[in-house]
Design a protein with these regions (language model features):
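Membrane-proximal intracellular helices of multi-pass ion channels
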Residues: 1-436
């Protein structure tokens, strides 16, 4: 039933995109109508079949729902690409759509600017809807249908801890979506002030706040050659990398809790540190001036750490030592509870504190050293979960890299592709640097 509701919501999104096609008088409007008809039909059927079903979801139901929702949304979301012949291969159409909904930003398209506006708008919208989570949106509307969203929230949450700012999870989701939409609207206005037209501004705002990285231009943000646009997008990519429950604290004027958050401090500190180091190296190893070195390094660090994947420069042309630093950034990621990928900063904070405690145990074997974050003790079970998650994450990267190398792909490109895919980055290393 919930999958059916999701598909009906996707149908509404198709109609919005058809409105864009109508505005530009382009033929892809019919493609959206056809896709919408098919999606609405299946959605109504599933909703009818699920009528009268269990309204309380278990944790297992939540995980199953999240998994099926991503697949279902992508399967039907690829229809406009496939029906219109813009991506004639089903596998490629599914790849492009899943890349959008997962906010990965990897693409198989090599002539983006030839696509009609409606298709480009849909391509950008997939990142915005998928960025914060299709399921998070669903949680906000589930109470209307008498369904609990707590287990869905637990399955969708991206960090080791799940923060709520209101006892009712549906209200929390609505607040978060309001902030998400507000940030997007503000960014649209600022980009238009920088010279972007309304269409490109909306599409790039979707890609920025959803940290997806799909651009309406083949050269990405570099197309505009505008320091103003680069700085604005950098700031909003950084904001989008912050835990949205923290942004709620900021909106509610709880500035002390906001500023004192351990994960936010780590996130901000890592951006400052990596930007400073890369800017200095660029200044002395490239023809860039001081301001340009700072701007390029700031943009690329935030773009990769937030897994957005926008590009203003070909970083594979930088000195090789910077490739290693950028790889670390890609692995690390931004904050849990944001639209970003990667391991997440909160796990880095926990790993750092666990490592520090282990060194202290060498000197004081009998000492009891709990892991504390934001003045709260982290339970051993959460610490174990974090360690297991990081081990599995790195193991998948190693195994995936070896498998790609076995298929004849170079080591650099193999590792770049795997890190990019598992972390929802988009760009990778080597030949997959700018277009993946």
């Amino acid at each position: 039933r919930i999958i059916g509701i999701l598909l009906l919501l996707e149908t509404v999104m198709f109609l919005v995109c058809s409105g864009v096609s109508f505005y530009y008088r382009e033929s892809d409007m019919l493609d959206f109508w056809k896709a919408g008809g098919i999606t609405a039909g299946v959605g109504l059927l599933l909703a009818a079949l699920g009528k009268g079903g269990e309204r309380q979801l278990t944790r297992r139901d939540g995980y199953v729902l999240v998994s099926f929702a991503w697949v279902a949304f992508s399967l039907f979301g690829m229809l406009p690409f496939y029906i219109g012949g813009y991506i004639p291969d089903i596998a490629n159409a599914f790849f492009e759509t899943m890349s959008g909904f997962s906010s990965t930003g990897a693409t198989i398209l090599d002539d983006i600017e030839s696509l009609p506006h409606g298709i480009l708008f849909w391509r950008s919208m997939t990142q915005w809807i998928g960025g914060l989570g299709i399921i998070m949106f669903t949680i906000a509307v589930l109470p209307i249908f008498g369904v609990s969203g707590l287990q869905v929230f637990a399955a969708e949450a991206s960090g080791p801890t799940h923060d709520k700012v209101h006892p009712r999870i549906g209200i929390t989701a609505k607040w978060i979506w309001s902030i998400y939409a507000g940030i997007t609207a503000l960014l649209v206005g600022l980009l238009m002030l920088g010279g972007m037209d309304w269409f490109d501004s909306i599409c790039h705002a979707f890609a920025t706040t959803g940290t997806g990285g799909f651009s309406t231009k083949q050269a990405s943000v570099a197309y505009y050659n505008s320091p103003y646009i680069e700085y604005v997008i950098s700031i909003f990519m950084f904001i989008s990398g912050i835990n949205f429950t923290l942004l709620l604290l900021f909106v509610n004027r709880k500035f002390k809790k906001f500023i004192g958050n351990a994960e936010l401090k780590f996130y901000f500190g890592s951006v400052v540190l990596f930007t400073a180091v890369i800017a200095i190296v660029l200044y002395y190893t490239s023809p860039m001036g001081m301001e340009e070195s700072f701007r390029k390094s700031l943009f690329q660090v935030i773009s990769l750490q937030t897994s957005t994947g926008f590009a203003t420069d070909d970083y594979m042309q930088w000195t090789p030592v910077l490739w290693g630093l950028l790889t670390i950034i890609m692995l690390m990621g931004a904050c849990a509870g944001s639209t970003t990928g990667g391991l997440k900063c909160i796990r880095m904070v926990i790993l750092t504190k666990v490592s520090r405690n282990e060194f202290k145990h060498i000197l004081h074997p009998n000492a009891i050293l709990p892991v504390r974050i934001n003045k709260q003790v982290i339970s051993p079970s959460i610490v174990s979960t974090v360690l297991a998650f990081c081990f599995i994450y790195i193991s998948i990267i190693v195994i995936g890299t070896l498998l790609m190398m076995a298929m004849g792909v170079g080591a650099e490109e193999s590792m770049g592709c795997v890190i990019s895919s598992i972390g929802n980055m988009g760009p990778g290393l080597g030949k997959t640097c700018l277009l993946y």
